[in-house]
Amino acid sequence: MIMDKKQFADFCADLESGRIRVAEKIDGNWKVNAWIKEAILEGFKLGTLTDMTEGQFPFIDKDTIPVRKFTVEDKVRIVPGGSSVRRGAYLAPSVIM
């Protein structure tokens, strides 16, 4: 699977919205969608190491999969303790991290 950064960003948006999922429950069993797993790995290959320091939390990671930012409108609770959510992760409303 070959994609560019724009295609990968669109792919992440589909993951974040829940339109596509890495795994699905089919007939009571969980099935991994291997093509999605491969696309996520491709995103790491596409990325460039970037300084993503946030306040007092310094870190360096690939620019294709940054930490997600949430607002009150997302209805997701992010509590203190070192949790982070990367780009491409789906969090339903009312989730507590």
Label each region the model flagged.
Residues 1-77:
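Terminal amphipathic alpha-helical/low-complexity segments used for targeting or macromolecular assembly
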Residues 72, 76-97:
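Structural signal for interior beta-strand "rungs" in well-ordered beta-sheet cores
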